[in-house]
Regions:
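Conserved loop-to-helix interface motifs that mediate assembly, gating, or partner/ligand docking
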Residues: 2-199
Length: 199
């Protein structure tokens, strides 16, 4: 049976753990609010751009661009698909990273010509441990996105697409539904499809 000293030590240990947990909760809440604010600022811009492209396509329906070229001459099994995978930089994120890894592995099963472009430390560690080749590593933290980082990623992907090193580009990331709910989103980026733009 534990003596009084051992019981006091355990109580102190539990109290210390509670303090650490509360501190982690406060930090997480602050980061979540910041991320939500960034999302609220960015989403209107994204949808405005989508609608603007839709209006252009309405007035120039026969516009030719390599970005709209579906490359029908390439068989589905021969298409080279680039997957941009966005993961977290740290663990302790519940199913956040796990769900992304699961979706990526499902995609890789159906495509033998896949290339991985990974953003985030957890993704890099996971795929390296699995022995999967990462085509190009973007050494950026996922939690601090910026326009210049997005531009660097875009330039690399577009270069490979225009050089026909890639036939399709897909992004896999976590979409925030509300303050507590998220889901893994798989979005087809290239080639563009006119019907996907709001007109």
């Amino acid at each position: 049976m534990a003596n009084a000293r051992e019981i006091l030590d355990r109580m102190k240990s539990i109290q210390d753990t509670m303090k650490i947990t509360n501190a982690m909760y406060m930090i997480s809440s602050s980061k979540l609010k910041k991320a939500k604010a960034s999302l609220d600022e960015t989403e209107p811009y994204f949808y405005s751009m989508q609608m603007a492209i839709g209006r252009i396509l309405r007035h120039v329906p026969d516009m030719k661009s390599e970005f709209f070229n579906q490359r029908p001459e390439i068989k589905p099994e021969d298409r080279k698909v680039g997957y941009i995978v966005v993961t977290a930089d740290k663990g302790l994120a519940g199913s956040y990273n796990h769900n992304i890894f699961k979706d990526v592995e499902e995609c890789l099963k159906s495509n033998s010509h896949a290339k991985l472009f990974v953003v985030g430390e957890m993704g890099r560690h996971y795929f390296e441990k699995k022995g999967l080749e990462i085509a190009h590593q973007f050494h950026y933290t996922a939690q601090n996105p910026s326009v210049s980082r997005a531009r660097n990623i875009t330039e690399k992907i577009l270069e490979e697409y225009l050089n026909k090193e890639l036939d399709e580009v897909v992004i896999i990331y976590t979409k925030m539904l509300n303050g507590v709910q998220t889901e893994t989103e798989t979005r087809h980026l290239l080639p563009l499809e006119k019907e996907h733009f709001k007109i």
